[in-house]
Amino acid sequence: MKVVYFSFTGNVRRFIARSGFENTLEITNDNCAEVRIDEPYILVTSTIGFGEVPDVVQTFLRHNGTMIRGVVGSGNRNWGQNFAKASDTISKDYMVPLLMKFEVQGTKKDVEEFKDKVGHFYEDNERKAI
């Protein structure tokens, strides 16, 4: 399963690197409007401001929203109810499961949970496709 991610401060990028997944794509200001994804993917995103979906992610999803299969959120618990809220919004707007949330760049346990959930999600979707 492809993992597409947006990293505002570098924390999500470090989290993805620690996961060991190779089939990844980082969306940035430079590529968010041009990139087209033609395979199912999991989106990992940070949250900005008071729980908003980053503009880069919104632009990317306008062109690639049909292939999203799940979302993972990153944030800082200091934001209280707005912690990783962008992932809640995306889950609701695109009717995909929110797989998990992690704080800052995640713990070792978070990385293991991510690997497990993405792996199981891929297996479940492959079985359904047969």
Curated annotation (Swiss-Prot):
<dbReference type="GO" id="GO:0010181">
    <property type="term" value="F:FMN binding"/>
</dbReference>
<protein>
    <recommendedName>
        <fullName>Protein NrdI</fullName>
    </recommendedName>
</protein>
<comment type="similarity">
    <text>Belongs to the NrdI family.</text>
</comment>
<dbReference type="Pfam" id="PF07972">
    <property type="entry name" value="Flavodoxin_NdrI"/>
</dbReference>
<comment type="function">
    <text>Probably involved in ribonucleotide reductase function.</text>
</comment>
<dbReference type="InterPro" id="IPR004465">
    <property type="entry name" value="RNR_NrdI"/>
</dbReference>
<dbReference type="InterPro" id="IPR029039">
    <property type="entry name" value="Flavoprotein-like_sf"/>
</dbReference>
<dbReference type="GO" id="GO:0036211">
    <property type="term" value="P:protein modification process"/>
</dbReference>
<dbReference type="InterPro" id="IPR020852">
    <property type="entry name" value="RNR_Ib_NrdI_bac"/>
</dbReference>
